[in-house]
Amino acid sequence: MSSLLLDNIGELVTNTAAGEGPLGIHRDAAVLVEDGVVAWVGPNGSAPAADRRIDAESAAVLPGFVDSHAHLVFAGDRAVEFAARMAGQPYTGGGIRTTVGATRAATDDELRATAHRLHAEALRQGTTTIEIKSGYGLTVVDEARSLRIAAEVSSETTFLGAHLVPAEYADRPDDYVDLVCGPMLAAAAPYARWVDVFCERGAFDADHTRAILTRGQAAGLGTRLHANQLGPGPGVQLGVELGVASVDHCTHLTDADVDALAGADGATVATLLPGAEFSTRSPYPDARRLLDAGVTVALATDCNPGSSYTSSVPFCIALAVREMRMSPSEAVWAATAGGAAALRRTDVGRLAPGSQADLMILDAPSHLHLAYRPGIPLIRQVLHNGVPQCRP
């Protein structure tokens, strides 16, 4: 058994009931890690001996970020589309087809290089658990290979064959849904933990969404959903009805949508993706409204080449505080424990005996600095499964 002691922690965020406030903060604390798992959390003066030691030098220590919504397997970029949008052209989601064409044309090694590069980029910024979706292949072969590559990077992989109806099926959406529910799902399921649908105007309607999620669930996959990004729609309430783990975007919500999420009592998380609103110059979700209603909220990057090309959870925390009326503590919780809830994980997003030893040391005395000092590389060191990773 190998052990590691992280001591002289000025502020330790645990996300447990044992500490101070909703973040479970401990002051002047230490953490003992044994074989990649947290074995003990307590006062610095009572810290047990260990094989190795890391001195936090009075800095803040947090659980690793849990990014529960990302798209890392793709080819090309859409910088020109971004520039055009900033010049006043509205985003309608059609640009996804540009990435589909590039992804289909790319080699496995090219897709693999992008996925690994973005994963490493996220890790340097404190993300130790990341969900990765397919959705830029939209053929049986390309969706399966996208998920196979994603599975090399993360155990949290999501089949998103229902990202958009591809051009070759534009006049036959029902036929494409049959393909997604049949051969595509069969090819993708061995590499996926989740199934997702983009339930939105111009993509998939409620009937198609229900059919795909129901079939995916029957194949043993958990369910998640993109909904209510571009406008009001049936997605949020349908997601709650079907018991999906997370409804993502939630930008345009009715009172009935909020009531449905609140009534789910945490079983369906509202995952907010402020990077998408930043990059599309769109209205931000009203996180305050959701939190005040008792909805469980997660924050994620939506890292993708079209509408949110960022892998930085700290950037999304700053946006959430500045633009979505979240407190810094609420935003940090949403990016750690909230993300874990969106993935139905209890072993990450918190620091307590038995949890995975995924954590970060900040170059700051408090978690507040993540929102207070936007754009500054505050992650001093990241540990994943108790193993120090490359420094930023």
Swiss-Prot record:
Single GO cellular component term: cytoplasm
Residues that, per the record, bind 4-imidazolone-5-propanoate: R78, Y136, H163, Q229, S307
Annotated positions binding Zn(2+): H69, H71, H226, D302
A Pfam family the protein falls into: Amidohydro_1
Record-listed E.C. numbers: 3.5.2.7
Subcellular locations according to the entry: Cytoplasm
Annotated InterPro entries: Amidohydro-rel, HutI, Metal-dep_hydrolase_composite, Metal_Hydrolase
GO biological process per UniProt: L-histidine catabolic process to glutamate and formamide; L-histidine catabolic process to glutamate and formate
Cofactors (names): Zn(2+); Fe(3+)
Keyword annotations from UniProtKB, A to Z: Cytoplasm, Histidine metabolism, Hydrolase, Iron, Metal-binding, Zinc
PANTHER family: IMIDAZOLONEPROPIONASE (PTHR42752), IMIDAZOLONEPROPIONASE-RELATED (PTHR42752:SF1)
Entries under HAMAP family matching the protein: HutI
Entry's family note: Belongs to the metallo-dependent hydrolases superfamily. HutI family.
Function: Catalyzes the hydrolytic cleavage of the carbon-nitrogen bond in imidazolone-5-propanoate to yield N-formimidoyl-L-glutamate. It is the third step in the universal histidine degradation pathway.
Protein name: Imidazolonepropionase
Organism: Salinispora tropica (strain ATCC BAA-916 / DSM 44818 / JCM 13857 / NBRC 105044 / CNB-440)
